[in-house]
């Protein structure tokens, strides 16, 4: 009674489970996931860490890639993106972590969302987190965490994080007042968190933290953001 919020009786698409491919990080990689998407299946990523050797490619209208337990997609060592989309409308990417690798310096992104997009059936990226840093090496890098070139895309709870702290190396002493390694320029390098070139892109919950240059570059027209968190790097020289 007197509920305020999303209409739970709105039209929806019911996907039978025989139309779903469940990917297991211990047995499946980008090749199997891309084969399933090309065959018209939607993809559920079981909890785990997927060490990708190629990009996951989404191009079919209505295609869905959804993680369980925040499945982690580790970027290919070649510098290719974790996910590349040619937005044909109605596509969904949800509940995944995109993780940077040690890659050559260059024009690398963790996610490239291109294509035309659809005003009548917008694609949605929900609960998508990206990180440059965290576990392991301080030499991971990316040029940009997320690029959205398609129009009419909806971003729902996006967190794009360059590490500010990391685990101490064996024998390393923290700075006074710190318990962890404080990340400095040249470590966990990433220029920008989000670049938007598409028009009519809407973000509901956008957090971008600690990038080396502009946190967000928004060149598309009529963009909207509802809640934006911006954390600058600790070093003012950045």
Residue ranges and their predicted role:
Residues 1-238:
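Extracellular/periplasmic carbohydrate-active domains that bind, remodel
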């Amino acid at each position: 009674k007197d509920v305020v919020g999303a209409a739970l009786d709105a039209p929806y698409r019911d996907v039978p489970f025989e139309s779903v491919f469940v990917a297991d990080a211990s047995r499946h990689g980008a090749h199997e996931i891309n084969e399933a998407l090309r065959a018209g299946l939607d993809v559920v990523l079981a909890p785990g860490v997927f060490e990708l050797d190629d990009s996951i490619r989404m191009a079919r209208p209505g295609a869905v890639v959804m993680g369980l337990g925040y499945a982690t997609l580790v970027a290919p060592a070649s510098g290719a993106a974790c996910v590349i989309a040619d937005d044909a409308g109605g596509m969904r990417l949800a509940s995944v972590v995109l993780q940077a690798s040690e890659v050559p310096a260059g024009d690398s992104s963790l996610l490239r969302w291109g294509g035309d997009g659809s005003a009548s059936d917008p694609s949605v990226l929900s609960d998508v987190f990206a990180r440059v840093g965290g576990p392991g090496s301080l030499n991971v890098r990316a040029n940009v965490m997320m690029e959205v070139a398609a129009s009419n895309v909806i971003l729902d709870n996006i967190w794009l994080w360059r590490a500010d702290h990391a685990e101490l190396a064996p024998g390393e002493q923290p700075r006074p007042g710190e318990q962890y390694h404080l990340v400095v320029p040249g470590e966990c390098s990433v220029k920008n968190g989000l670049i938007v070139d598409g028009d009519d892109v809407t973000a509901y919950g956008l957090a971008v933290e600690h990038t080396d240059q502009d946190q967000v570059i928004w060149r598309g027209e009529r963009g909207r953001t509802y809640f934006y968190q911006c954390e600058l790097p600790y070093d003012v020289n950045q």
